[in-house]
Amino acid sequence: MTATAQQLEYLKNSIKSIQDYPKPGILFRDVTSLLEDPKAYALSIDLLVERYKNAGITKVVGTEARGFLFGAPVALGLGVGFVPVRKPGKLPRETISENYDLEYGTDQLEIHVDAIKPGDKVLVVDDLLATGGTIEATVKLIRRLGGEVADAAFIINLFDLGGEQRLEKQGITSYSLVPFPGH
């Protein structure tokens, strides 16, 4: 099933836009409204599974927290394992970490050291691509463990915030179902 314009429009219309959230001047794209619509949620998963079913993916990595909501069902659909990337102190086994920059300060992500094996072909899944900082840190973690990042997939791409270009500089291609301008 290749995504049709009608299907993609349905997904786009299922995502509510909230003006001035979380602060004035921001137009927030609320992916949780897509999750509330079982047809839209299933369609988003089905389209990603269809796109990657013959790509030789061996692991799907999802970033905390909404990346779990899309990454885990995509992993099930592909018949591969799901690996969570989390904020510090949330994973019980030995981890490695990677810092990344935020608008005001830094944050950190962690992954279990035994979750990715050398040679694993990894699909990174998250709900939204904005500046790309979270995904760039996730890619670095995967590569440090010997994994190959095959692609990064998103439900939403805020295309004018530079995330795609940032990932391209890391040699990562990306795919998104719904483009929106970023605000």
Swiss-Prot record:
Its EC number is 2.4.2.7. GO terms for biological process: adenine salvage; AMP salvage; purine ribonucleoside salvage. Transmembrane segments: none annotated. It is found in: Cytoplasm. Gene3D superfamilies: 3.40.50.2020. SUPFAM superfamilies: PRTase-like (SSF53271). GO terms for molecular function: adenine phosphoribosyltransferase activity. Signal peptide: none annotated. Keywords: Cytoplasm, Glycosyltransferase, Purine salvage, Transferase. Homodimer. Belongs to the purine/pyrimidine phosphoribosyltransferase family. This is Adenine phosphoribosyltransferase. It comes from Shigella flexneri.
